[in-house]
Amino acid sequence: DPRFQYLHLPVTTGDIVPHCFEDVPNSYLDMVDGQLMHILDTLWSAGRNAIYFCNAGKDRTGVVSALLLQRMGASRQEIVDNYVLSADNLKTMLADFVAKRPELKLEVVTPRAWTMEQFLDRVPDKLRSISQNA
């Protein structure tokens, strides 16, 4: 369909599932690199509606969504609230995912406000580091 342009822009880092929920914000920070900035710039400059997603729709998609919302001027609370919506939306899928992978804990993979708050606290330093190395 010529009305659509498909771009495959994978997040190339941060693919290790943390063992405890306290490590989740750091796993999100690991995703923030030049490739993620390219993804954000591509979505930002699309000039029309865009769909983006990952396998589960909460980690990589959550990080991209948070940074896009931040770029759009959304409040910190709006970003956190948006992220936490995934907990209810993905409840069944996450329970099935954990049931198939006994090494994982539901408390680690469930989106929490604390996770996004910690990520938002730490991401400015990471973004500065990326821009200085560009």
Where do the PLM segments sit?
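Cys-dependent protein tyrosine phosphatase-like superfamily
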Residues: D1-I51, V63-A134
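Ser/Thr-glycine-rich phosphate-binding loops at phosphate-binding pockets of nucleotides
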Residues: A56, R60-T61
